Amino acid sequence: MAYEDLIKSIESAAEEKKQEVLRNAEREVEAILREAETESSAIHAQYLEKAKRDLILENNRQKFLAKQEVKKRISAVRQKLIDDAFSRSKEKISGIRSDPSYPALYERLTREVISALAGEEIILHIDPADSKICSDVLKKTGIVCDIMQDITTIGGLSGTSADGRIRAYNTLESRMERIRDTSTLEIINLILGGPDG
């Protein structure tokens, strides 16, 4: 009987040990599952946070690109308005030679060229259509210089030093270009009522 009791005792101890191992295993499994769930939640939260950041960045990028496109289109419209304004201005002054005030304007333009080339031997470059007016202005002012009828312009003239190093452009076209280059902002303000329209 002692042998049977011993076997029962061993079996009972083995059963208890088995139950204890199973309980420990269940606790470990539960702990692992809780940890996995916590990690999964953290990973999910990180993924959501990254997705939110990515969406915000993409949204901001798209807004920036849209604003840039709007600015580009506004700039193109402004440039077209400026181009149109200068084209109309050029058309309006294209018949200036027939205006009674042209000789006085031509005299002023000639004096500006002469002044810009002061101290130099001067060559005036004129449109053949202005040869009479130019001769009259030079006689009136007493200025002596060479004249070359070698440019085509809607009005005005240019001049160079005899050696060609110094040039003074005073055609109406060159004056319009200078105005265009230096006064674009003012022109935009006049056309649109401000730099931002």
From Swiss-Prot:
BP-aspect Gene Ontology terms: proton motive force-driven plasma membrane ATP synthesis
InterPro entries: ATPase_E_C (IPR038495), ATPase_V1_Esu (IPR002842)
Gene3D superfamilies: ATP synthase, E subunit, C-terminal, F1F0 ATP synthase subunit B, membrane domain
GO molecular function list: ATP binding; proton-transporting ATP synthase activity, rotational mechanism; proton-transporting ATPase activity, rotational mechanism
Keyword set, alphabetical order: ATP synthesis, Cell membrane, Hydrogen ion transport, Ion transport, Membrane, Transport
Claim: Cell inner membrane is one of the keywords in the record: no
Compartments where found: Cell membrane
GO cellular component terms given for this protein: plasma membrane; proton-transporting two-sector ATPase complex, catalytic domain
Keyword Nucleotidyltransferase: no
SUPFAM superfamilies: V-type ATPase subunit E-like
Membrane-topology annotation of the record: Peripheral membrane protein
Assembly behavior: Has multiple subunits with at least A(3), B(3), C, D, E, F, H, I and proteolipid K(x).
Physiological role: Component of the A-type ATP synthase that produces ATP from ADP in the presence of a proton gradient across the membrane.
Protein family (similarity comment): Belongs to the V-ATPase E subunit family.
Protein name (Swiss-Prot/TrEMBL): A-type ATP synthase subunit E 2
Species for this entry: Methanospirillum hungatei JF-1 (strain ATCC 27890 / DSM 864 / NBRC 100397 / JF-1)
Phylogenetic lineage: Archaea, Methanobacteriati, Methanobacteriota, Stenosarchaea group, Methanomicrobia
